[in-house]
Amino acid sequence: MITQRQKDILNLIVELFTKTHEPIGSKTLQNSIASSSATIRNDMAALEKLGLLEKAHTSSGRLPSQEGFRYFVEHSLNPDSLDEQDVYQVIKAFDFEAFRLGDLLQRASDVLANLTGYTALILDVEPKKQRLTTFDIVKLSNHDALAVLTLDEASPVTVQFAIPKNFLDSDLMTVAKIARERFLNQTVLDIHYRLRTELPQIIQKYFPRTDNVLDLFDHIFNPIFQEEVFISGKIKTLEFAGLNTYQFLENLQSVALEIRQSLPEDELHRVQVADSKEKSLADLTVISQKFLIPYRGFGILTVIGPVDLDYQRTISLINVISRVLAVKLGDFYRYLNSNHYEVH
């Protein structure tokens, strides 16, 4: 347990260090702490013994340890402390007309990366929890067709495909019939299971040759099994992390899995200070927060940066962006209706 003065000293050192990245001495702290330099030095020594501060190699000053940053995040952070200029920049950035859901999510990722200077990711609603509400196949020509899948009433996905050479129009209708009977109102997780277990036997009843039909179903439904991930500032990881981290971020499905596993369902936000189980992120800070996607569930905003990032500003930015984004998404979904399709 630390005293209030020691807590104030730690908070001030974290605040100053994240702005200057220079060791902080007792004389610097005297301007804000109403105590003598000797008293402040004693408190700094006590904080060092507790593992919250570290000695600098090049000066007599101190800097926060990983435990010190964690303590600050858990006990002193004020996520509702917002800078007016940051709020203005966020609102201004979202002052545009979005034609697709992805436009808003990508803009959020871009704004978060630009204002923090770190890597930002936005995750859409987790695929496995969504339900298939409509399914249609539209024939475009004699050679290709379009499958239209709607998830949770407001997230249409289209998949264009080449019609198998041995297919008649009635065969396309049969594919649509099977999909509706077996998959409508089922979760994406259930659909994935049924594609592997029930579907092969069902198709045998309708088609003499099943290989290309199974491949067609896989092609049509594969997009809804993939995470929607919007990333910005990936190149910035090379400034504060190694090549391994950059390469890890190349595989967005693995990144999405790591983010979801690190943020339990019953938590809205989490700050990992050099605490990730993923080796490529183990020496970094990963900040994740859920945000509301109206009518569908929750997405996730994530920032990946160095341990000595500015926690107060970064988390405040995540807060304001999540709020503005939720409002914009609400407006977008109120406008959207069943006749609007997202074409991929």
Curated annotation (Swiss-Prot):
It comes from the Bacteria. One of its GO terms (biological process) is negative regulation of DNA-templated transcription. The keyword Transcription regulation applies. Gene3D superfamilies: 3.30.450.40, Heat-inducible transcription repressor hrca homolog, domain 3, Winged helix-like DNA-binding domain superfamily/Winged helix DNA-binding domain. Pfam families: HrcA, HrcA_DNA-bdg. GO terms for molecular function: DNA binding. InterPro entries: GAF-like_dom_sf, HrcA, HrcA_C, WH-like_DNA-bd_sf, WH_DNA-bd_sf, WHTH_HrcA_DNA-bd, WHTH_transcript_rep_HrcA_IDD. The keyword Transcription regulation applies. Keywords: Repressor, Stress response, Transcription, Transcription regulation. Transmembrane segments: none annotated. Negative regulator of class I heat shock genes (grpE-dnaK-dnaJ and groELS operons). Prevents heat-shock induction of these operons. Belongs to the HrcA family. This is Heat-inducible transcription repressor HrcA. The gene is hrcA.
